[in-house]
């Protein structure tokens, strides 16, 4: 399992430059030829490690890879590589400026030379992080709203108040001061019975007898 993963990773890394690499046909439709200003052709182009230069040319031309001095002097004697197949593809493998010229006499002087600035390869896209985990299952759905409690009982109707009990008519005289003919006047208090004349005389006699008796007793004692 581990070796399979490693092999797949190597294949991926090897494929990345190929995916982003570009092939530039030198001179475009004109190809590799004399009487063409290749500095103009370079304008607006960016070359990176991993790209390829394709030289398409006729039998009278060829391609030599030289250093800066050979480029400046149109001297191919110190060339590191020479090609004459008519369709030469050269991979750009190092950062820096690569110099090319046609070694045919007089062609380099007529502008058949090329200096290509090579930049580092474009950074490979970062490996996408693992996809976000699936959203967690939401917690139990919210509980259904509780059944509302029974509505409050309607207020009981007020009990009819009983009429005030009838009170007996007051015996007090009416406020207008006029005595009611129907109101009974309390009877006068009874008078003690008067003594008859006989009883009075008997009482006086009794008191007289008692007085005489007391006097006689006092006289005897003294």
Curated annotation (Swiss-Prot):
Residues where lipid is bound covalently (GPI-anchor amidated asparagine): 198
Annotated Cu cation binding sites: 61, 102, 107, 112
Bilayer topology: Lipid-anchor; GPI-like-anchor
Proregion residues excised on maturation: 199-222
GO cellular component entries: plasma membrane; side of membrane
Disulfide bonds, paired cysteine numbers: 74-108
This protein's UniProt keywords: Cell membrane, Copper, Disulfide bond, Electron transport, Glycoprotein, GPI-anchor, Lipoprotein, Membrane, Metal-binding, Signal, Transport
Alphabetized InterPro entries for the sequence: Cupredoxin (IPR008972), Phytocyanin-like (IPR039391), Phytocyanin_dom (IPR003245)
Compartment list: Cell membrane
Annotated spans, Disordered: 121-198
Signal peptide interval: 1-21
Composition bias type Pro residues, residue spans: 125-172, 185-195
Molecular function GO terms recorded: electron transfer activity; metal ion binding
Domain of life the protein comes from: Eukaryota
Phytocyanin domain boundaries: 22-120
Cited function: Probably acts as an electron carrier involved in oxygen activation and/or lignin formation.
Protein name per the record: Uclacyanin-3
Lineage: Eukaryota, Viridiplantae, Streptophyta, Embryophyta, Tracheophyta
Gene name of this polypeptide: UCC3
């Amino acid at each position: 399992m581990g070796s399979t993963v490693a092999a797949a990773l190597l294949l991926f890394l090897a494929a990345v430059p190929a995916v982003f690499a570009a092939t530039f046909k030198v001179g475009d439709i004109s190809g590799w030829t004399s009487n063409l200003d290749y500095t103009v052709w370079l304008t607006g182009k960016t070359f990176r490690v991993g790209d390829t230069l394709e030289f398409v040319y006729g039998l009278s031309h060829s391609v030599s890879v030289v250093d800066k001095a050979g480029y400046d002097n149109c001297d191919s004697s110190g060339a590191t590589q020479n090609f004459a197949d008519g369709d030469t593809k050269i991979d750009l493998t190092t950062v820096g400026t690569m110099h090319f010229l046609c070694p045919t006499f007089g062609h380099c002087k007529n502008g058949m030379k090329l200096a290509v600035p090579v930049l580092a390869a474009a950074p490979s896209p970062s490996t996408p992080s693992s996809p976000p985990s699936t959203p967690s299952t939401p917690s139990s759905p919210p509980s259904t709203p509780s059944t509302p409690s029974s509505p409050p009982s309607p207020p009981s109707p007020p009990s009819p108040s009983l009429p005030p009990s009838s009170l007996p008519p007051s015996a007090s005289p009416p406020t207008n001061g006029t005595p009611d003919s129907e109101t009974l006047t309390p009877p006068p208090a009874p008078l003690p019975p008067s003594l008859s004349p006989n009883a009075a005389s008997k009482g006086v006699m009794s008191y007289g007898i008692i007085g005489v008796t007391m006097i006689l007793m006092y006289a005897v004692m003294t």
